[in-house]
Amino acid sequence: MKLVFCILSTLLGTFAYNPDHIAGTTPPYLVYLKSDYLPCTGVLIHPLWVVTSAHCNLPDLRVILGITNPADTTEHDVEVSDYEKMFRHPYFSVSSISYDLMLIKLRRGIKHSYYAKAVKLPQHTVPVNAMCSVSTWAYNLCDVTKEPDSLQTVNVSVISKAECHNAYKAFDIRENMICVGIVPGRRLPCKEVTAAPAVCNGVLYGILSYADGCVLRADVGIYASIFHYMPWIENIMKNN
């Protein structure tokens, strides 16, 4: 099936997992976290701070803003920064998707520009049925050994915890989680960069912890609810 999908995608000239996806420039808050292992997605929330999933605590991370195609080494208007320190949530465990959040303090502040701008943080929970933009990078399925080469965004809605539980019966969907996507997901080949953000009306409400499939094709994803972690986020930023 993967081979057929690869051939069709090559003929059509696209590797979009969802026909409703949006391709284009990188959202100014979106961060590509490059490592010697696997990349992750992050979000700029302050000139000195990036938030991502705790499972992205990977060796030799480099923080890259403004990049559309990580496989293109000639891309312009890209800003690269080293990090000073990582702060994983103290309750995070690799055996669970709970508390899957991490803050990264940059070595130097990112200058506000068209290509780099911090996203707003939430002051309340996100309502069910709210429309959100989920962005991350997709891999070319014909050669997943290379860097991902396609930035994509899909607009999907927040679903209820009951709907989410129906999609993920093996998981305990807690108050500090939100679920975004379509039930049920579509079982097509896909590979994307993990830790995609859910931004609703310009506000960051979620960071992806888990998805059985790919969020770029609108499969349901379980996200850390940023609002529920605001006390921890504010405390780390204030004291470091």
UniProtKB/Swiss-Prot annotation:
Catalysed reactions listed for this entry: Preferential cleavage: Arg-|-Xaa, Lys-|-Xaa
Domain Peptidase S1 span(s) in chain numbering: 17-238
Gene3D superfamilies to which the protein is assigned, alphabetical: Trypsin-like serine proteases
Listed Pfam families: Trypsin
Active site: 55 (charge relay system), 100 (charge relay system)
Keywords annotated in UniProt: Disulfide bond, Glycoprotein, Hydrolase, Protease, Secreted, Serine protease, Signal
Protein name in the entry: Putative inactive serine protease 58
Annotated source species: Rattus norvegicus (Rat)
